[in-house]
């Protein structure tokens, strides 16, 4: 990856560089030497700001988790029917994933080998359970088809949303987000992705009117 210039170094750029290195090499496969070279600064400069790479990991996954949990505190996630709140949360999850793509990608790839990773996994489970509770509530209110198994549906919804990190790239043609991979398999703006996920999820879940 491109080495950051020393004269542009800030704690925020260090975190951004660290996230990219963690994603590329894996957290366990990343040393402070790797981070030093990628950031273009000495290891002592890094230690001036953080205790070590695990603190960088915690800051990175905390950023993703704070954004996700923040969705649940927004007004439209708390007011209205369960189905309305669920759709709002799903849409906002996709928006946050795309806006914080590297940070959410890293969050989804932690393995649980360190205290920070185990903490992040526990927080992820807590978030997932709260969204699952919304789906259960929507089913209890009669807004979900009777033939839909709620637990399976929850897993499929999260699977669809989380898979976006594998193909979505914000620097698609003409500044629009696009799919990754050779040949540039088309482009999709952020709003198009959000709308497509919502249509697929709720077109399958909702009862026919």
What are these regions (language model features)?
Residues 66-69, 99, 116-141, 150-155, ...:
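Amphipathic alpha-helical packing segments from all-alpha helical-bundle domains
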Residues 85, 97-117, 166:
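Amphipathic alpha-helical segments used for helix-helix packing
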Residues 1-25, 29-41, 54-58, 63, ...:
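Basic, helix-initiating cap at the start of DNA-binding domains
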Residues 47-50, 54:
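A short His-aromatic
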């Amino acid at each position: 990856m491109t080495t950051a210039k020393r004269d542009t170094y800030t704690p925020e750029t260090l975190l951004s560089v660290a996230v990219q290195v963690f994603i590329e090499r894996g957290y366990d496969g990343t040393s402070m030497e790797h981070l030093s070279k990628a950031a273009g600064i000495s290891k002592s400069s890094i230690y001036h700001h953080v205790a070590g790479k695990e603190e960088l990991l915690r800051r990175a996954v905390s950023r993703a988790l704070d954004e996700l949990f923040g969705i649940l505190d927004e007004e439209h996630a708390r007011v209205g029917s369960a189905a309305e709140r669920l759709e709002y949360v799903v849409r906002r999850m996709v928006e946050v994933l795309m806006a914080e793509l590297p940070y959410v990608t890293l969050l989804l790839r932690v393995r649980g080998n360190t205290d920070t990773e185990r903490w992040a996994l526990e927080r992820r489970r807590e978030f997932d359970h709260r969204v699952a509770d919304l789906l259960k509530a929507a089913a209890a209110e009669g807004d979900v088809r009777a033939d839909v198994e709620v637990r399976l549906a929850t897993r499929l919804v999260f699977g669809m949303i989380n898979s976006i990190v594998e193909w979505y790239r914000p620097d698609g043609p003409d500044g629009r987000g696009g799919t990754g991979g050779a040949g540039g398999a088309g482009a999709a703006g952020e709003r198009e992705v959000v709308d497509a996920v919502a249509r697929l999820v709720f077109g399958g879940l909702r009862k026919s009117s």
